[in-house]
């Protein structure tokens, strides 16, 4: 509830001044803390390119709306290929319990949960994520 209120109040201002927000650690924590467990561990340029910059890309709003409108959970059982699910234990956007549910519903899935990681494990723990992805893809060849 507090996060929703904060984003209603501060979100437009953060968006308007996003490059400055990213450069200042206390503002970066305030703006991205709800999504990324430790946003100050990420390089500012990477945070801009992969997170904030993506939010202003054409199509981002449409993609987010589609995600909200369409519940994919009932279709997870239709996935026939090996699937790697990577989740941050400290994800504040979609709780880790959802990952457990998705894993149970998805045949041939493998679930990896990263401790001390939030909503974007590929950015928060890139070395571990990339090694895991390399290993998963090599095993599936």
Give the role of each language-model region.
Residues 30, 62-66, 100-101, 128-135:
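Alpha-helical elements of Rossmann-like donor-binding domains used by nucleotide-donor carbohydrate transfer enzymes
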Residues 1-4, 45, 82, 98-102, ...:
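Short, glycine/charged-enriched secondary-structure capping and boundary segments
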Residues 92-98:
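Conserved alpha/beta-hydrolase "acid-adjacent" motif
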Residues 77-80, 105-106:
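Short, conserved loop/helix-junction motifs that constitute active-site signature segments
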Residues 18-78:
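Conserved alpha/beta-hydrolase catalytic His-Asp/Glu region
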């Amino acid at each position: 509830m507090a996060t929703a209120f904060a984003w209603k109040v501060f979100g437009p201002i953060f968006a308007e001044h996003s490059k400055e927000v990213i450069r200042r650690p206390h503002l970066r924590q305030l703006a991205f803390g709800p999504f990324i467990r430790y946003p100050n561990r990420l390089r500012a340029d990477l945070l801009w390119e992969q997170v904030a910059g993506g939010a202003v890309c054409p199509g981002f709003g449409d993609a987010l709306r589609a995600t909200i409108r369409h519940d994919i959970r009932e279709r997870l059982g239709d996935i026939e290929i090996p699937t790697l699910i990577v989740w941050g234990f400290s994800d504040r956007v979609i709780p880790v319990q959802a990952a457990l549910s998705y894993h149970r519903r998805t045949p041939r899935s493998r679930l990896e949960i990263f401790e001390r990681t939030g909503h974007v494990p590929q950015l928060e723990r890139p070395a571990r994520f990339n090694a895991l992805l390399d290993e998963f893809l090599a095993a599936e060849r």
